Amino acid sequence: MEQELTFRIILEKPPAGVDFGLQQGRGSNYEVVQKQRSKTGDLHFEFTARVKNGKDGPTLLGPFVQGPPNERFVYLGIGTFAGQTDTPWSRRLKIPLRGITWDVIKQASAQVLETRVRGTGKDGSPTCGTIKPFAGWKVKPL
């Protein structure tokens, strides 16, 4: 049985003047959607993924989902990876899709799974790479 889940990423206070976007597709065959230029506040990205019964629990599928079944994630493109030409930044932010159990899926059926990610690194540049530590996904109202 497949079910569709809605996800929301809140990128908290990224550096101003940088483009961010959600990567749809894989490898070199992708496009950036929901492109946003940071100003002073948070950026919000939403996407859906299908979930089906996998060998070791839920398996997420869809055009935004990347990686092997047990290590799924989504990418946010930063700077040139989001299509911005007037920037020194050329990065991606890897947001894990882990910790999503059948119990969480049941709770989230008519709601959204939300995570909050720090948008600025310790050096003042856009956060990039794999999110560590990752706070996980929380069930929130739509």
Regions found by a protein language model. Name each.
Residues 27-81:
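Tryptophan-paired
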